[in-house]
Curated annotation (Swiss-Prot):
Main location: membrane
Occurrences of domain tr-type G (ranges): 2-184
Protein name: Elongation factor 4
UniProt cross-references to Gene3D superfamilies, sorted A to Z: 3.30.70.240, Elongation factor 4, C-terminal domain, Elongation Factor G (Translational Gtpase), domain 3, P-loop containing nucleotide triphosphate hydrolases, Translation factors
InterPro entries named in the record: EF-4, EFG_III/V, EFG_V-like, EFTu-like_2, G_TR_CS, LepA_C_sf, LepA_CTD, LepA_IV
Function: Required for accurate and efficient protein synthesis under certain stress conditions. May act as a fidelity factor of the translation reaction, by catalyzing a one-codon backward translocation of tRNAs on improperly translocated ribosomes. Back-translocation proceeds from a post-translocation (POST) complex to a pre-translocation (PRE) complex, thus giving elongation factor G a second chance to translocate the tRNAs correctly. Binds to ribosomes in a GTP-dependent manner.
Length: 598
């Protein structure tokens, strides 16, 4: 066990975690220069396209240190985006130390701080690494000063490297071997292993990634999942190189995988403890904190025939993304579906894209919503995250929405544009901190509902990519909230309802009505599209009717003949409007639900 090091790379988004992981893999000789490609651990197309890491990935690297010692390094590459902090916490629970990466040109950013605190909570050894020293804009001394002042770490211990050019990679590996302690655990104790990831293979069943803390597991053993008591016989164990590499056993301190033919997807839970059925441990390992979803949205299949297929895909997807929470839901307009909870808007987008790409699902997602707390006139309180279940306004005494404390770090020159953006999003109580010359940290309280839609994208736009953002939920505060209904031909469309602040209601209503007007095809009669709060109409668009020229066959003659034909047409249209139902195409829902991003 003294020959094992378990470590993770944590950093702000885009500070070079995946590039450094690529270089470490190359240095360990797992890939030849010919096989090499960028972002080697990011397996999903979507990760490579967006240039971000979504899933933590594990790889075991063989390394001979400078003093000739052979060491096994278990590296877990983590995501940097605020929405995937749960993936980071799972990775940290399996490590003894971390490399905290800081970009030499950008310095310490919001997510760097958030990840540092997470590593401190797990009591891990922290090695600061200053990356991107090859850039012309790199300011190493200033970055060292920030590491001292903002992170409270000894900057003289920081390792300098350029992951892109491959400089300083040996220094990073030596620091891992020298400074990160080997895992502690007892080989002769009963098996206890923590599941930190899992994915479904249609041939082999569920493949579980775990960190063994005590004991050992080998093929033929009968294991038990402690959360539900399910038992299975182990078929194969091994470690992760770039693909799975079978081993005779996994011993205490090792990170690897276990295949035991689990076909019941719900039996394997991330955060669960594996033990031997014949000699179980008395108590499970402390898992991870429960996930609290922040953003809610409903997912419906475009064709109602695909409902069961979507249910199956969600169950398999949940294995690989423990942060997703879902339950059954139904809508008059869209049929059967699922109400899902996400960690943020990027998480929502990724779930949508992965369901479409990896599981071949065609889906519609409703407007994202947050969880509101309502106090009713009878004194009871209720939590609502779905506009369909928003009670009658007469019954509501007060409504409260979640507020966050946002921490925004930006170059000083963007101060005006960022403050305007925050105030437009109903931000209050700004506080300013100047960590280093030319940089400002703004702390501000904002409603989560305003941040959920497009705040992060807009912040990146106004700061030309230099702004960084992190947030913590603080509390629910009383706000003037209303339910905005969209009516088409005087009928409510439940899938388009949303809960908004009264000040923003008209702006939203106009936006949705105008978008629907473009999408709904013309009928034989006029269609009114209205936005309403209760019985009060606050916005309207009209889809004009097709019109047949009924007077075309009248050549000259008495005007009363033409008038009679026009009156007859008018009556027919009126009758048609009373009985005619408007077909809203699925494309209209998709277009309107994207209206918030534009």
């Amino acid at each position: 066990m003294t020959k094992i090091r378990n470590f993770s790379i944590i950093a702000h988004i885009d500070h070079g975690k995946s590039t450094l992981a690529d270089r470490l893999i190359q240095r360990a000789g797992l890939v030849t220069d010919r096989q090499f490609r960028d972002q080697i651990l990011d397996n999903m197309d979507i990760e490579r396209e967006r240039g971000i890491t979504i899933k933590s990935q594990t790889v075991t690297l063989p390394y001979r240190s400078r003093n000739g010692e052979e060491v096994e390094l278990n590296l877990i590459d983590t995501p940097g985006h605020v929405d995937f902090s749960y993936e980071v916490s799972r990775a940290l629970a399996s490590c003894e130390g971390v490399l905290l990466l800081v970009d030499a040109s950008q310095g310490v950013q919001a997510q760097t701080l958030a990840n540092l605190y997470a590593a401190m909570e797990h009591d891990l050894t922290i090695i600061p690494v200053i990356n991107k020293i090859d850039l012309l804009s790199a300011d190493i001394e200033n970055t060292r000063a920030q590491i001292e002042s903002e992170l409270g770490l000894d900057s003289s211990q920081a390792v300098l490297c350029s992951a892109k050019e491959g400089r300083g990679i040996d220094d990073v590996l030596e620091a891992v071997v020298d400074r990160i302690p080997p895992p502690s655990g007892k080989l002769d104790a009963p098996l206890s292993a923590l599941i930190f990831d899992a994915h479904y293979d249609s041939f082999r069943g569920t493949i579980v990634a775990c960190r063994v803390f005590d004991g050992s597991v080998r093929p033929g053993d009968v294991i038990r999942f402690m959360s539900n008591g399910a038992t299975y016989k182990v078929e194969e164990v091994g470690v992760f190189r770039l693909s799975r590499e079978p081993k005779k056993e996994l011993r205490a301190g090792m990170v690897g995988y276990v295949i035991s033919g689990v076909k019941t997807v719900s039996d394997t839970r991330v955060g669960d403890t594996i033990t031997l059925d014949s000699n179980p441990v008395p108590a499970p390992l402390p898992g991870f904190k429960e996930v609290k979803p922040v953003v809610f949205s409903s997912i419906y299949p475009i064709s109602s025939d695909d409902y069961l297929s979507l249910a199956d895909s969600l169950e398999k997807y949940k294995l690989n993304d423990a942060a997703l929470i879902y339950q059954k839901d139904s809508s008059v307009a869209l049929g059967q579906g699922f109400r899902c909870g996400f960690l943020g808007l990027l998480h929502l987008e990724i779930v949508q894209e992965r369901l479409e790409r990896e599981y071949d699902q065609s889906i519609i997602m409703t407007f994202p919503s947050v969880q509101y707390v309502l106090t009713l006139e009878d004194g009871s309180t209720t939590m609502v995250d779905n506009p369909q279940y928003y009670p009658d306004p007469i019954r509501i005494r007060t409504s409260a929405e979640p507020f966050i404390k946002a921490s925004i770090i930006i170059p000083e020159r963007y101060m005006g544009a960022v403050m305007k953006l925050c105030l437009d999003k109903r931000g209050v109580n700004p506080r300013f901190n100047y960590p280093t010359p030319g940089r400002i940290e703004i702390s501000m309280e904002m409603p989560l509902a305003e941040v959920v839609f497009d705040f992060y994208d807009k912040l990146k736009t106004v700061t030309q990519g230099y702004g960084s953002f992190d947030y913590d939920l603080i509390e629910h505060r009383v706000s003037d909230l209303v339910k905005l209904d969209i009516l088409v031909n005087s009928e409510k469309v439940d899938a388009l309802s949303l809960i908004v602040h009264r000040e923003r209601a008209r702006e939203w209503a106009v936006q949705v009505c105008d978008r629907l007007k473009e999408e709904i095809p013309r009928h034989q009669f006029k269609i009114a599209i209205q936005g309403a709060i209760g019985g009060k109409i606050i916005a309207r668009s009209t889809v004009n009717a097709f019109r047949k020229d009924v007077t075309a066959k009248c050549y000259g003659g008495d005007i009363s003949r033409k008038r009679k034909l026009l009156e007859k047409q008018k009556k027919g249209k009126k009758r048609m409007k009373m009985v005619g139902s408007v077909m809203i195409p699925q494309s209209a829902f998709v277009a309107v639900l994207k209206a918030d991003n534009e």
